[in-house]
């Protein structure tokens, strides 16, 4: 006899399962109300005596309830019905229910250790993880082909970010186009953000833009200090006008303006650093941010950019105070320092920045270094030109721009024709291939000669 399960597939008749179910119900009632082993076997014989080739599992359970009541075991029948109902609830509940309960109770080891940058006991992080559990369940059951899910479970591949995949409007990592938003204005939550006129203001707005972008994606992001350099000049011009209006001498105007600027740059960098580390995105963490320091991105504002880079490195060397007042290395932002001709040659104008970066690395293990020369050799755009640009967040690099023929499809107001487009671009759909597994399961022996 075959038993038809609730999902439609058939299994062999197994009388032991009936014995187990009734015995579990037996334990819930008084001894005189229990069914004896003979009575249980009689119920099994009755079902087998029906002579059916196939029988629904629900029909079997109905027969058991009817037979228990026919021999006066009403309380036992009631307990069996309860047991049957409980099993039905368990069947209906999926892994999502259990994962959510374990997360809320702090018992889910996976979510507790899933991301070292997130504390699973914090409410904002739990909210993100709750959404992630639901997204993962939907992704596995409805969105991904079965062979992809199987390959992921077997470790052949790793399908990243299933906890965000269900919401297809989200993307992974990106390079934030701060230049466009700061120079041409933008809006956050329906509030117009106009072009700032001071470096300190620009740094504050930058942190708000970064947080807004980070809350609309699930990967890391990167900005470049080049986009903030023009506002150093704006601040300098502000101070020059301020002291010039006071009818001071040219020397006094230059002196006082330089002193004001010397104070504003550290204030702006400090504001930026504390804002980034104290803000929380919808992902339940501080923005996963990297900051690029690339002198070669600008000629017009190179000196102003050097001022910002110097201050960023100095403050990173100092560190940030933790809750106990001890200076530590902040997790974010990560720093990316581009090595180029002007800063790798001891006689170069900006070599002092590389020396400062090296001291920072020795103490804080940042910045990471990017070789302009090597990148331009490897990142060739469709026009045949090598380009240098930062990674997004921690490690992912965009592909070289191959879309020169389509023009300004993003409608960016800072678009430059025939110049590679990188800021404002993102990646999506990261999958890791387990190459050792592929090699070992290929069944081929590859012999290499020295």
Describe the residue ranges of each PLM region:
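Charged, amphipathic alpha-helical regulatory modules used
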Residues: 1-106
């Amino acid at each position: 006899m075959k038993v038809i399960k609730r999902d439609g597939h058939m299994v062999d008749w197994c009388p032991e399962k009936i014995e187990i179910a009734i015995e579990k119900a037996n334990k819930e009632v008084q001894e005189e109300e229990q069914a004896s082993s003979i009575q249980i076997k009689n119920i099994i014989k009755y079902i087998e005596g029906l002579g059916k080739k196939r029988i629904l599992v629900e029909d079997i359970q109905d027969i058991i309830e009817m037979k228990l009541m026919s021999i006066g075991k009403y309380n036992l029948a009631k307990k069996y019905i309860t047991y049957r109902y409980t099993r039905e609830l368990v069947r209906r509940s999926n892994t999502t229910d259990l994962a959510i309960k374990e997360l809320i109770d702090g018992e889910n080891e996976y979510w507790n250790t899933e991301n070292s940058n997130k504390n699973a006991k914090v409410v904002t992080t739990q909210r993100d993880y709750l959404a992630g559990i639901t997204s993962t369940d939907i992704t596995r059951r409805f969105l991904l082909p079965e062979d992809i899910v199987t390959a992921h479970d077997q470790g052949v591949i790793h399908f990243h970010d299933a906890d965000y995949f269900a919401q297809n409007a989200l993307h992974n990592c990106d390079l934030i186009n701060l230049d466009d938003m700061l120079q041409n204005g933008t809006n956050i939550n329906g509030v117009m953000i106009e072009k700032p006129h001071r470096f300190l203001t620009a740094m504050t707005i930058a942190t708000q833009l970064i947080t807004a972008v980070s809350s609309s994606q699930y990967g890391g992001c990167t900005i470049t200090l080049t986009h903030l350099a023009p506002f150093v000049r704006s601040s300098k011009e502000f101070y020059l006008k301020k002291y010039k209006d006071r009818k001071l001498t040219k020397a006094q105007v230059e002196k006082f303006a330089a002193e004001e600027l010397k104070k504003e740059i550290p204030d702006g960098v400090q504001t930026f650093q504390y804002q980034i580390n104290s803000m929380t995105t919808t992902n339940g963490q501080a923005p996963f941010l990297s900051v690029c320091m690339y002198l070669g991105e600008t000629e017009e504002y190179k000196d102003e950019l050097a001022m910002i880079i110097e201050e960023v490195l100095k403050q990173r060397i100092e560190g940030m105070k933790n809750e106990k007042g001890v200076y530590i290395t902040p997790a974010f932002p990560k720093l990316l320092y581009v090595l180029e001709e002007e800063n790798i040659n001891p006689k170069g104008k900006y070599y002092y920045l590389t020396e400062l970066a090296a001291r920072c690395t020795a103490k804080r293990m940042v910045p990471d270094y990017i070789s302009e020369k090597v990148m331009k050799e490897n990142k060739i755009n469709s026009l045949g030109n090598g380009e240098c640009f930062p990674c997004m967040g921690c490690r992912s690099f965009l592909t070289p721009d191959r879309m020169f023929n389509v023009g300004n499809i993003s409608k960016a107001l800072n678009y430059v024709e025939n110049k590679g487009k990188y800021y404002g671009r993102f990646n999506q759909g990261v999958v890791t291939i387990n190459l050792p597994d592929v090699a070992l399961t290929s069944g081929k022996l590859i012999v290499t000669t020295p």
